[in-house]
């Protein structure tokens, strides 16, 4: 059985991170490139949002006794295989897991323009993940 308190807490954190990113989504590329603190804030907040999704997915996988994921990317594949996530969202979240690995392990090669582009693209996917999990688990 899924530990609903853990999931609710992680969903609340994810909601906060999405709101924080939403507040910055209209920043222009020129401003983004010129403001090192803003870039780092957005990078870190994107990282935390993806970590929240991974935590939520990991708890569901563990609690439901689903197959053991091979890596972070595979965590979302497991949820997709089990019907928790639609196929297109699963693919997008798997890419986010790859992005997370770059932020954590290969941060020296981060491209600021790529980060800016990710900010512009992922908010809807993060929201959809949150709503899908809430609906699937009956959380209002």
Segments and roles (model prediction):
Residues 1-140:
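Solvent-exposed interaction patches of small proteins and small membrane subunits
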């Amino acid at each position: 059985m899924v530990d609903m308190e853990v999931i609710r807490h992680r969903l609340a954190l994810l909601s906060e991170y999405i709101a924080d990113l939403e507040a910055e989504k209209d920043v222009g590329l020129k401003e983004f490139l010129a403001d090192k603190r803003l870039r780092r804030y957005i990078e870190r907040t994107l990282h935390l949002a993806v970590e929240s999704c991974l935590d939520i997915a990991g708890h569901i996988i563990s609690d439901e006794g689903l197959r053991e994921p091979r890596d972070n990317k595979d965590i979302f594949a497991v949820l997709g295989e089990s019907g928790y996530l639609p196929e297109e969202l699963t693919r997008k979240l798997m890419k986010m897991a790859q992005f997370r690995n770059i932020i954590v392990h290969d941060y020296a090669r981060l491209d600021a323009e790529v980060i800016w582009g990710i900010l512009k693209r992922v908010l809807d996917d993060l929201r959809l993940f949150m709503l899908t999990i809430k609906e699937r688990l009956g959380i209002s």
